[in-house]
């Protein structure tokens, strides 16, 4: 097919506008997101290590995302039952053992126009999501608009965990900016990830998974914002490989 283009009127000029929600925090180590409006989806079976990963990312003093947020909201039936209570100092209204339309809407309302940097942790509440279409709709809307939920100067990030990637409703999981996947033998889960996110030949993707899952608690980290040959990491180590973009895009 031959494609030609005719230049537009030179008066049409599109330039970039800067948003405070896109400010870069270069004290956060790469390849973790340095712009605090990310949505990280962490997928792993019980015992895979996903809870330990979250605690290391958020609670480890002086590391990674520790002290990077003005407020942290936790929705989890299990994180608050740990012996050392890693989120024990959070105000009562920021901690919930389940996810409901009321407590999530209240949290969203409380951050509006605050200009604060906010983190939501939704740990093992997939069943709560699936109980109510209203929750799914509200959560999906919040995720799509997360850059602006806290108003000018603010930003909102989400970390959501699930035992299986495709147990998260599609409109929600498709807004993720970063995916962490622990070892899985669930063919449907892998196929869904491949169909939705991956443009490599399937056999190459399986080779990458095999390389990443060589030890029990290893994971593959996928940065959706990167090009097809830069998006894959074994744990947080950048992978280099020879492959092609199947779509040509």
What name fits each language-model region?
Residues 80-83, 100, 223, 237:
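Alpha-helix initiation/capping motif
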Residues 40-62, 67, 77-81, 96-203:
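Conserved P-loop NTPase motor cores
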Residues 91, 96-100, 240-244:
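Short, flexible N-terminal segments of the mature chain
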Residues 19, 31-34, 156-158:
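Residue-level signal for well-ordered alpha-helical segments
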Residues 2-3, 24, 28-47, 53, ...:
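P-loop NTPase motor core of the ASCE superfamily
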Residues 83-93:
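Short, aromatic/basic amphipathic alpha-helical patches
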Residues 72:
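An amphipathic, basic-hydrophobic helix/alpha-beta surface used to engage anionic
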Residues 1-29:
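N-terminal pre-Walker A segment at the start of P-loop NTPase domains
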């Amino acid at each position: 097919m031959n494609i030609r283009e005719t230049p537009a009127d030179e008066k049409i000029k599109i330039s970039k506008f800067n948003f405070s929600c896109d400010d870069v925090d270069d004290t956060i180590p790469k390849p973790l997101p340095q712009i605090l409006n990310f949505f990280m989806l962490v997928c792993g079976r019980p015992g895979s290590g996903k809870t330990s990963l979250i605690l290391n990312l958020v609670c480890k003093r002086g590391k990674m995302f520790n002290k990077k947020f003005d407020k942290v909201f936790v929705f989890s039936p299990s994180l608050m039952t740990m012996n050392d209570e890693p989120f024990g100092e959070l105000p009562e209204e920021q901690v919930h053992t389940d996810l409901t339309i009321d407590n999530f809407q209240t949290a969203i309302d409380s951050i509006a126009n605050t200009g604060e940097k906010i983190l939501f942790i939704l740990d093992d509440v997939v069943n709560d999501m699936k109980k109510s279409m209203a929750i799914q709709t509200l959560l999906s809307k919040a995720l799509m608009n997360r850059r602006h939920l806290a108003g000018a100067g603010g930003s909102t990030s989400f970390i959501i965990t699930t035992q299986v990637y495709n147990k998260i409703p599609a409109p929600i999981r498709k807004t993720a900016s970063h995916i962490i996947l622990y070892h899985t033998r669930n063919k449907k889960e892998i196929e869904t990830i491949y169909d939705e996110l991956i443009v490599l030949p399937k056999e190459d993707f399986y080779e990458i998974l095999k390389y990443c899952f060589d030890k029990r608690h290893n994971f593959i980290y996928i940065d959706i914002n990167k090009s097809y040959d830069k998006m894959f990491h074994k744990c947080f180590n950048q992978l280099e490989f020879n492959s092609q973009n199947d779509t040509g895009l």
